[in-house]
Amino acid sequence: MGYSYSEKKRIRKDFGKRPQVLNVPYLLTIQLDSFDKFIQKDPEGQQGLEAAFRSVFPIVSNNGYTELQYVDYRLEEPEFDVRECQIRGSTYAAGLRVKLRLVSYDKESSSRAVKDIKENEVYMGEIPLMTDNGTFVINGTERVIVSQLHRSPGVFFDSDKGKTHSSGKVLYNARIIPYRGSWLDFEFDPKDNLFARIDRRRKLPATIILRALGYTTEEILNLFFDKITFEIAGDKLLMTLVPERLRGETASFDIEANGKVYVERGRRITARHIKALEKDNISQVVVPSEYILGKVASKDYVDLESGEIICPANGEISLETLAKLAQAGYTTIETLFTNDLDYGPYISETLRVDPTYDKTSALYEIYRMMRPGEPPTPESSEALFNNLFFSAERYDLSTVGRMKFNRSLAFPEGEGAGILSNEDIIAVMRKLIDIRNGRGEVDDIDHLGNRRIRSVGEMAENQFRIGLVRVERAVKERLSLGDLDAITPQDLINPKPISAAVKEFFGSSQLSQFMDQNNPLSEVTHKRRISALGPGGLTRERAGFEVRDVHNTHYGRLCPIETPEGPNIGLINSLSAFARTNDYGFLETPYRKVVDGQVTEEIEYLSVIDEANYIIAQANSNLDENNRFTDAFVTARGERGESGLYKPEDIHYMDVSTQQVVSVAAALIPFLEHDDANRALMGANMQRQAVPTLRADKPLVGTGMEKPIALDSGVAVVAKRGGTVQYVDASRIVIKVNEDETIAGEAGIDIYNLIKYTRSNQNTCINQIPCVNLGDPINRGEVLADGPSTDLGELALGQNIRVAFMPWNGYNFEDSMLVSERVVQQDRFTTIHIQELSCVARDTKLGAEEITADIPNVGESALSKLDESGIVYVGAEVKGGDILVGKVTPKGETQLTPEEKLLRAIFGEKASDVKDSSLRVPNGTSGTVIDVQVFTRDGVEKDKRALEIEEMQLREAKKDLTEELEILEAGLFARVRNLLISSGADAAQLDKLDRTKWLEQTIADEEKQNQLEQLAEQYEELRKEFEHKLEVKRKKIIKGDDLAPGVLKVVKVYLAVKRQIQPGDKMAGRHGNKGVISKINPVEDMPYDENGQPVEIVLNPLGVPSRMNIGQILETHLGLAAKGIGDQINAMLKQKQEVEKLRSYIQKAYDLLGNGSQKVDLSTFTDEEVLRLAGNLRKGLPVATPVFDGADEAEIKELLKLGGLPTSGQITLYDGRTGEKFERPVTVGYMYMLKLNHLVDDKMHARSTGSYSLVTQQPLGGKAQFGGQRFGEMEVWALEAYGAAYTLQEMLTVKSDDVNGRTKMYKNIVSGNQHMEPGTPESFNVIMKEIRSLGLNIELDEE
């Protein structure tokens, strides 16, 4: 396998046995693709903005003489780029311009002649744009729109599982769910009548819906029942016989024909009887006249002479009616065929409870149910019913809904519209009745074929459509008002409702979330999150266990491991590593196609619906070199996702990868297969909380997923095109692009500006560090600079730490850990946190607030860190209470005391009419000011500091652009020089000339002269573009800022805090093994091995067996082996051994077992490359053990041997304090440890006095409110148990809510009088008031 220049720097040894058929797809596809579909023009108008416009336009006036037509739209370029929007606190968005056409028709003309057409472009608000990394910048903060898993539109058949009725009878129901519009439900009641509900309102007999569709009783019966025909022949009654219908019934008379008795009376009719009847072709039997009694007529029987109805349709036949029918001359009678077994009389029974008799009365009934209290008219009731299900404007099943509907009811694919038809409704009722009759079964709602993903684009489109519909109403009103001569489309459209709808969605929707930016993994997982909550989804309280459970259709689509603990468990999921959504929004996962027992390289994506009919083998099935299954029986998933053993020739597909089942976070856990699922869940979740350390350290034991996550997260800088590094410093990298990758006529220079020390959403530090050197050859897609938590383009969330599993004097009781002081000294877990504090100067009623260094009653020392504008210097070290920005607020006129008047008279007008409202550092925070930004409103004079910052920004912008220009010019002039020299010019002569003169030379060769002229033009273009860019930049910087109403100035101060690790901080491994640091121990007291090397962290071995996360032990062993090999390489480098020895040792390590997917051949490496590789392997050979396909025990032992270590993985340790040997060998190795964002500094908090709650007068709770500690019920019991009455009394009175008592107490303490007078706690008064509010008088009797 060929390695690029930077990949050769450090190669991870892969233990995977199976070749990688499919690389992990780009991880942010779900977000980017969805939004692209929303924004890009779709010529078919099926999706995105185009679909929204086409669904609302044209808007026709009520009189029909004018209409507003939609032509097309365009998005403008955003004013500021992403970075500028973040700094300014604005939204990264593009203006939407829509071309509309107002057409008015001639009222006089009969043939709709066009009278006038006006066309112009209308501004319709702003659409937030997605950044390259799948996020949105809204008001300066990065947000993510989480995809939603909701119930797919279509028809669903379900049952109440016997929970509704006390008898336990199972009631079936059907529900038609459109994409938008009214829901239609059908349900059985305990009496087996069929009812319908519209939008979950009051239920009506289902036949009312059929009558409203225009069906008569007779037609309704014809739709749902088979018939039995009776013939009256003299005094005999003959029945047409369909033998199959008799199965299971008991004969109430002898069934005989042609003198042969087939079934005797009272006998149950069996299959044998039916066979005999069918064999003899018996089509009619004589039945006693009692047999027809109680049967139901299928149509109206009318006495033709008198016109009297003898027996109505759905009426029962009695002896009397039978006689009347015979008398009226009817010889055949049709009745409905029903039985108790599988042909129930449900519709017939329902017609009996149906109060309506024709279409109008049915429509009235529906109108009364939908609009109670309004009198129905024929027109209004008809219009209401038609609008419910048969109007494309109000009702849409959508393509997905229609597809699901047709599949459920076995209609041909692709037929039917977005609205319902009569056939659709009847088919649903028929299927529901069939299910009640025992044919067919109900759907599984949690099946992923019944739930679909709704992503950003689709949700944004829905919001946009809501805004458009609001606009449509207003436009219709305007159009009908008349006087259209003076009106243009511009006047008709008010963009406010549209921008409000869009803004509300992006700003405050439940699914628009503040991006989790702790580290690259948390960003990627947040964007791949799938939530069942949100608008149109479930709610936490209502969701039961079934919805939250892992379903077998989740396989390869949703991760069974990664989900939050707590109330949202199972409702928020994560996309599996290879999953994607299809056009309908259903999740699909890739499989390798199997043909006749041979696995091909062909890959197909299948959704759950498609997958149902196939047998699919697992990814770890054994294959021979011809890709055929070696086992006689293969474990595979068959019907309904149940696994079983199948013959190789029966198998249709095979999984693509062993990591296919889990999400990216779970795929980062090595030896996941040896961890208990609950702990793996914690491990996957805690990796997202790891804080980026000062120096990222790649994991020694990884899974091979580290690289794709780091690259796809967008935190690292990746080369867009290949080339050579021409310039590199801490803040920018310049690449001279390879000739073959440049476009003709461009300079071929790529400039990458790096992000330096910026604050993330979680206050961690984002910083990019170059990892290439001058002159390095670079390929497209290679890493140029590492971001937070990345190391040479690999995800590096924590540090490799030498750990020992042993108890140590109780310091690792209950999951706590003992940490060596060396870890602190080496800054292994030191992190940088950046806080943003802002100070806002507003225009108040009493006058404007002012930012100034002249603050009343503040000493010189407090102002020492401020400049003359009253803003802190960059680089100042500040602590809690220090002033960062001086600000004064005008206060109202106050009555002056005579003394003040005197002082005023002597010293003149003192600035006493302002109060100090400066921005101070919050208590308990300290740090260094790393940046200050000043935003000034348009029209307000800028202060000195703002001008300095502006000047600095201009200088930097100019420097950036000048450098860019110089580099581009250098590239261009190099080409000019080559051209001139190739045409015979003298190089020495050329170099004496000014470069711009080169362009004025003439060349005899015409083609070369043309090239030179082209280059001269390009030079001119470059200069012009430089001037233009500089001017644009200058305008942006000088321009006043767009601040909120009433705000004059905003100053933002950024503080950086360096936090070392300390007792109380939370740490964790990757296997859910979390704990708190109990003590930082001196190095000399830590246990050490025979070489005198101390361990860095001591973990409790009791945390392993009960939690069943054995993966951590295997990781520790493999980590030890990897480090051992690193030590051997280090020793060889120190002894300066020849390269060949190094090469063969490293080759041996790579060739050792495993490596199914990757063979490393060091013979193709130059000596220099081998040495560079060895230098990077000094700290240990990084290994990858992919999930479910990792290293096994034998391989770990071999690797330990190669590293010259005991194969048990256990080492004799000595006590650092006494030097004595511990009783038995201890498991020592290297584990990857993370520092989580739960730092004791953020949690520690103390209060003496502070704010109190308004009603109860008790101290508030929580650090944010500077609250007290709650002395709760159980604590009270504890003091009661000790009999500490006085302590308890002060807890419940003066230390809590006895207002007078605590004031007196304070006075007493001040005056040195240690005395307490408790009174009545305020909460007693509150409870008395509450009881009185119930109308019960309650008083406290003073004794």
Swiss-Prot record:
Its EC number is 2.7.7.6. GO terms for molecular function: DNA binding; DNA-directed RNA polymerase activity; ribonucleoside binding. Gene3D superfamilies: 2.40.50.100, 2.40.50.150, 3.90.1100.10, DNA-directed RNA polymerase, beta subunit, external 1 domain, DNA-directed RNA polymerase, subunit 2, domain 6, RNA polymerase alpha subunit dimerisation domain, RNA polymerase Rpb2, domain 2. Pfam families: RNA_pol_Rpb2_1 (PF04563), RNA_pol_Rpb2_2 (PF04561), RNA_pol_Rpb2_3 (PF04565), RNA_pol_Rpb2_45 (PF10385), RNA_pol_Rpb2_6 (PF00562), RNA_pol_Rpb2_7 (PF04560). PANTHER family: DNA-DIRECTED RNA POLYMERASE I SUBUNIT 2. HAMAP family: RNApol_bact_RpoB (MF_01321). Belongs to the RNA polymerase beta chain family. This is DNA-directed RNA polymerase subunit beta. It comes from Haemophilus influenzae (strain ATCC 51907 / DSM 11121 / KW20 / Rd).
